[in-house]
Structure formats: structure tokens, C-alpha cells
């Protein structure tokens, strides 16, 4: 029996990556039990989570950039609107991560789940970082306005 853990511990990283992209026919030719090999599924989950990670990061980065530009212009009303939107986006993405994690928890094996949850924890921490950056920028704005008065 070949498992995901065996492949990644016994093979080099390059071989493991190359092996993960083999199709089902090639796996049958190698004489390996396909149901026991989690690498193709793990690779798909990995790529899917990486793609999912990029979209919220772009959105949050854009919102932070917009907030910083609004701070420079001292447009507080529009800033608060964008800040509110950014918090809503962070909450929605955070909920989606939890929901996706629950789905993964019921469908994947333990090592795959560990990798996928690791990526989701990283994504969650980046979203928290984006929200924190928004909070810091709002505090900066209010201090700047208070000192100006």
C-alpha cells in the first residue's frame, strides 16, 4: 500500500511534484493502487487553495491602498465607507474559509487535510493582517485629524 505520506517521505521534492501530476492511466501502468494515492487530489487542493488565496489578497490590498489614498486626501466620509466594505469582505472571506475547511474535513484524508488547513490558516492570518492594517490606518486618520484641530 502506497500512501501520501510514504510518497513525500521516500521521494525527493522534485519526484513528488512530478509524480503528483501523473494521470490515472500512468498510475495504473505503474501498478500502484489509485485509491490509496492521495497526491493528485492533494495537488489539486493545493492549487485550488493557492488560487483562492490570491483573490482576497488582491481585494484586501486594493482596499488598503484605497484607504491610504483617502487618508492623504482627508476624505473621512468616503474612507469610512471603504473601511466598512473592507471589513465586510474580510468577514465574508473568513466565513468562506471556515465553510471550505468544514467541507475538506469531511472529504479528505488526514495529511491532505493538514496541508489544506495549513494554507487556510495562512490565508486567515493574511486576512486578519489586512483587517488590522485597516484598523491601524483608521486610528492614524483620527489621530491626524485630532492633531490638525
UniProtKB/Swiss-Prot annotation:
The organism's place on the tree of life at top rank: Bacteria
GO cellular component terms, semicolon-separated: plasma membrane
Cysteine-cysteine disulfides: none
Membrane-spanning intervals of the chain: 39-61, 82-104, 119-141
The entry's keywords: Cell membrane, Membrane, Transmembrane, Transmembrane helix
Compartment(s) where it occurs, according to its Swiss-Prot or TrEMBL record: Cell membrane
Record membrane topology: Multi-pass membrane protein
Family that this chain belongs to: To M.pneumoniae MPN_090.
Name of the molecule in the record: Uncharacterized protein MPN_129
Amino acid at each position: 500500500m502506497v500512501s501520501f505520506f510514504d510518497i513525500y517521505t521516500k521521494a525527493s521534492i522534485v519526484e513528488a511534484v512530478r509524480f503528483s501530476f501523473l494521470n490515472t492511466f500512468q498510475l495504473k501502468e505503474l501498478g500502484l493502487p489509485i485509491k490509496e494515492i492521495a497526491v493528485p487530489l492533494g495537488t489539486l487542493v493545493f492549487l485550488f487553495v493557492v488560487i483562492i488565496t490570491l483573490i482576497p489578497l488582491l481585494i484586501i490590498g486594493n482596499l488598503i491602498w484605497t484607504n491610504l489614498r483617502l487618508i492623504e486626501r482627508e476624505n473621512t466620509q468616503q474612507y469610512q465607507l471603504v473601511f466598512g466594505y473592507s471589513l465586510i469582505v474580510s468577514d465574508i472571506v473568513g466565513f468562506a474559509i471556515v465553510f471550505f475547511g468544514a467541507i475538506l474535513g469531511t472529504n479528505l484524508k488526514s495529511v491532505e487535510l493538514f496541508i489544506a488547513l495549513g494554507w487556510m490558516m495562512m490565508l486567515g492570518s493574511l486576512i486578519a493582517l489586512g483587517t488590522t492594517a485597516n484598523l491601524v490606518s483608521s486610528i492614524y486618520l483620527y489621530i491626524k485629524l485630532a492633531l490638525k484641530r
